[in-house]
Amino acid sequence: MLDMEAIIQNLQQEMNRGTLVLAVLTQMDQQQYGYSLIQALNDEGIMVEQNTLYPLLRRIEKQGLLESIWQVEGNRPRRYYKISELGIKVRKELIKEWKLLEKSMANLIGGEV
């Protein structure tokens, strides 16, 4: 049986996974490469690792939510991502859903903290 800390850690990971797409889409109005996006998210308290972010970026690019281009800076090629028109529309809808969920959760939780 898992102890309480392990259970909480697992549940926190599940919650974070569910919000990561929206978190990424909110940061993509300007071109970003993977590492700069990790830093931006971490600065806002969304802790994400490379092995989580890069597959997510590829997946949501394949869905048409992001566009990417390769650019060479110095000697290193970097893949830069930017939100697509579809991504902007999806982000807007996800934000609406987030706000509804936030309101519902606030009602459910009430003063419990």
Where are these regions (language model features)?
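Beta-hairpin "wing" of winged helix-turn-helix
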Residues: 63-76, 82
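Short, aromatic/basic-enriched loop-to-helix "N-cap" motif that marks the start
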Residues: 50, 76-77
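Basic, amphipathic "hinge/linker" alpha-helix immediately C-terminal to the N-terminal HTH DNA-binding motif
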Residues: 77-95
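Amphipathic alpha-helical dimerization/coiled-coil segments
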Residues: 89-113
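Short, Lys/Arg-enriched N-terminal segment that forms or immediately precedes the first helix
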Residues: 1-13
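Basic amphipathic alpha-helical segments that dock to polyanions
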Residues: 53-55, 59-60
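Alpha-helical residues within the helix-turn-helix
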Residues: 39, 61-62
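N-terminal helix-turn-helix DNA-binding core of bacterial DNA-binding proteins
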Residues: 12-52
